Every structure is written in structure tokens, then in C-alpha cells.
Amino acid sequence: MDSNSRLMTFRRREMVEKLKLSGIADNRVLAAFLSVERHRFFDKESQEYAYADGAYPIGYGQTISQPYTVACMTSLLVERSPSGKVLEIGTGSGYQAAILYALGYRVYTIERVVELSEKAEKLFSALGFSIMCRSGDGTLGWPEEAPFDGIMVTAGAPHCPETLLHQLALDGSLVVPIGAHGLQKMTVFQRKKDRFEKEVFSDFAFVPLIGREGWG
């Protein structure tokens, strides 16, 4: 292991300790954050920022979310839908999908920006991660592969995309930030036999969800 690899490993461990202090308690989630090399999802000139607890721009008006945000969303999903097939809306850098893959999910991910989708797909291949990628309008989901045990939306929606709700399996969970531009409430919907149960959590700030059932 060279000096840079040792430094990145040290910073990744520091990041996980900070997540623990911030209230992330699920050991499966913490182990996934320790195993996935977050710096691989940054361009080389930006890797020094990979383990800081902040969002970072990745081009095309998109960002890689701060570690705490990723950990919070992941914990909400794992608690309710601990295994199975999951769909991510908004591939971005690919980091969130990689965390889900490390947790043992079968992962499908959709990205609106073709260039980001292609970049993430190449990185997944290089890392040996079997993650299914496509580009397109994520608000419409992936009907050919539905139903999903979990769906995670990594952009701020004005309301819950109805199409995604109906691509959930029974007892499946949808994690989505809902609200105005710049500030949303993390929201979880769980599909029951005759209804959808809804839970609302803390405030977060995401880039807008663009699509037919998003911000247009």
C-alpha cells in the first residue's frame, strides 16, 4: 500500500468515526462506508476533498452528497428494506449505488445526464461492481425491472413521484427528499397491502429532481 492509499484509508476511517458521532449506528451501514473507497468517485485533482463531510460538485450541475446524507438515507432504507432489489434515482458519481451494492443489494440506477451515467458505469466495471445502469428520466422508474424492495431518490422532489410508489414491492420502501428548491424533508413511504405509510424526517438540501414527475 503506497502512502496515498494509506492516507485515504486513514481518512475513510476518520469519516466513519464522524458518522458514528453524528448518530449513524447501523453496523452494516458503517461497514459499507468503510469498505467503499469514496475517493474513487472523485476526479484525481479533487480526491483530497473526498472524506470531508460536505457535498462536492461533480459537473453538469450535480454533486456528490456529503457522507452523512448518504449514510442517513441508507440507514432509513436498510432499517425497512434490509435486502433484495433496489433502484436508485440519480446515479451522479455512483457513490450511493456503490454503498448499496456493498450492503448486498441488487442495484439498479438511473441518471438523467448521459455523461455521468457512462462515467459511473465505467467506474463500476473497474471496481468489479455488478450494478445495472441506464440513462433517462428517473421519475418514471425502471418498469421492466419492477417491483423493487427499495427505491432511493437522490435529488429533491416537489412531491412524491407516483410512478415510483407503484414500482415498490409489498413492504418495499421509497426514500425521497420532498420540498421546495434548496430545502427538503427526508420522507419515507412504505407499501402495505392496501395503503402507503409515510414518515417524515429531518431537513436536507438536494439538487432538484428533474423529470416528468419532478420539477419538469
Swiss-Prot record:
<dbReference type="GO" id="GO:0030091">
    <property type="term" value="P:protein repair"/>
</dbReference>
<comment type="similarity">
    <text>Belongs to the methyltransferase superfamily. L-isoaspartyl/D-aspartyl protein methyltransferase family.</text>
</comment>
<dbReference type="InterPro" id="IPR029063">
    <property type="entry name" value="SAM-dependent_MTases_sf"/>
</dbReference>
<protein>
    <recommendedName>
        <fullName>Protein-L-isoaspartate O-methyltransferase</fullName>
        <ecNumber>2.1.1.77</ecNumber>
    </recommendedName>
</protein>
<dbReference type="InterPro" id="IPR000682">
    <property type="entry name" value="PCMT"/>
</dbReference>
<keyword id="KW-0808">Transferase</keyword>
<dbReference type="GO" id="GO:0036211">
    <property type="term" value="P:protein modification process"/>
</dbReference>
<dbReference type="Pfam" id="PF01135">
    <property type="entry name" value="PCMT"/>
</dbReference>
<keyword id="KW-0963">Cytoplasm</keyword>
<keyword id="KW-0489">Methyltransferase</keyword>
<dbReference type="GO" id="GO:0032259">
    <property type="term" value="P:methylation"/>
</dbReference>
<dbReference type="GO" id="GO:0005737">
    <property type="term" value="C:cytoplasm"/>
</dbReference>
<comment type="function">
    <text>Catalyzes the methyl esterification of L-isoaspartyl residues in peptides and proteins that result from spontaneous decomposition of normal L-aspartyl and L-asparaginyl residues. It plays a role in the repair and/or degradation of damaged proteins.</text>
</comment>
<keyword id="KW-0949">S-adenosyl-L-methionine</keyword>
<feature type="active site">
    <location>
        <position position="65"/>
    </location>
</feature>
<dbReference type="GO" id="GO:0004719">
    <property type="term" value="F:protein-L-isoaspartate (D-aspartate) O-methyltransferase activity"/>
</dbReference>
